[in-house]
């Protein structure tokens, strides 16, 4: 399949303006900065800050960018656009989507994996003629995930399950000969997509997420604010706000 331009993705997916703007911003950052594991985060931050001065800190142990979009803008569709762009333009094949609760987790599973679902986000995109392989927090222990190296994979996890399962995820998995956490941390191209990321900035889950050593983090939230004691602290890694 060809490399899909942001115009092409926006057209096929009928993206709304804020979704399209977000995709273009990701493209500009990915084209300006050589994103790789172990890169100099300070230099990368300087590059992002020069393009989007609102971003002053990645706030994590890896490059993480927040797109602050009002509720109802269609964040799942935007995730699909991010995935399509990173897959076809940058050859990224491993995506780890974190959901803040069971309801959103179930919705993400359907919207990202079920072509018969009217809200299936990859409809019409030739690169997903065969739907991407989905690995969920219900089946990561049993699935022989290492057998699907060639395909694009989307791991979908509920943050609460992630917190509870963390000890299991650190146990050796007979299929992969490593713990699931180690397996993910060793992937060269893991992109973390955090839905409603304001929910789990303070939780220990964030430490667990840092330990996955992703290549890149993309955060989507309508409320880019953390409550710290009686104060409300704004996210420092926002690159786009709508409205």
Regions found by a protein language model. Name each.
Residues 8-9, 81-83, 134-147, 176-179, ...:
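Short alpha-helical segments and helix-capping/turn motifs at coil-helix boundaries
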Residues 119-174:
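Inter-Walker segment of RecA-like/P-loop motor cores
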Residues 31, 58-61, 75, 114, ...:
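ASCE P-loop NTPase motor core, strongest for the SF2 helicase catalytic module
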Residues 91-123:
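Conserved Walker A/P-loop ATP-binding site and its immediately adjacent core
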Residues 84, 88, 102, 109-110, ...:
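Signature of the SF2 helicase/ATPase Hel1-core->accessory helical subdomain module
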Residues 75-85:
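Motif I (Walker A/P-loop) of helicase-class P-loop NTPases
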Residues 71-73:
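The conserved Walker
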Residues 1-68:
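Conserved pre-motif I regulatory segment
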